[in-house]
């Protein structure tokens, strides 16, 4: 589940460069806001994305993959106010999803492929609108132990094997 602005990140890219759904896979695309600058709607369509993910958790899918597009999309704007609001909105809706996942017994993995929102200004004091090279967190939340684990090292290449291991594949 993702909004349209970053939908390819959890479909086309994750499925090896194809737009086709695999058997037992469903794609949920929530339309991103149209006709308004993104810095004026830092929540984008996240409330609807989170609602859809929570519905999926209650349905009992084996695995749900989602993209909260806000940090990346709003991070490319020059508005500090929009970036702050974006972080607040993501925090709130991520909390909703994590609580629902825990209630349903899901393991939760949280990460990003790059930084963006965390640096408001460039070294010369201008608004930063580019990706950063800062390390991003990887959180593993286990509902059975109520533990959140944050490994000290790892990379994006470790995510798929970790997920497959959790799924018993």
Map each language-model feature to its residues:
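Feature captures the catalytic ectodomains and active-site-proximal regions of enzymes
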Residues: 1-169
């Amino acid at each position: 589940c993702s909004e349209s602005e970053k939908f390819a990140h959890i479909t086309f890219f994750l499925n090896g460069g194809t737009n086709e759904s695999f058997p037992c896979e469903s794609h949920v695309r929530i339309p991103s806001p149209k006709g308004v600058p993104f810095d004026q709607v830092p929540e984008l369509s996240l409330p609807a994305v989170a609602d859809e993910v929570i519905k999926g958790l209650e349905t009992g899918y084996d695995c749900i993959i989602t993209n909260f597009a806000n940090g990346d999309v709003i991070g490319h704007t020059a508005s500090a106010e929009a970036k702050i609001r974006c972080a607040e909105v993501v925090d709130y809706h991520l909390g909703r999803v994590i609580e629902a996942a825990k209630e349903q017994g899901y393991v939760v993995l949280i990460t990003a492929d790059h930084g963006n929102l965390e640096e408001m200004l460039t070294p010369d004091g201008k608004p930063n609108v580019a990706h950063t090279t800062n390390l991003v967190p990887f959180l593993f939340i286990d509902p059975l132990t109520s533990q959140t684990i944050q490994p000290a090292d790892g990379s994006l290449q470790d995510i798929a094997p970790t997920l497959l291991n959790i799924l018993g594949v």
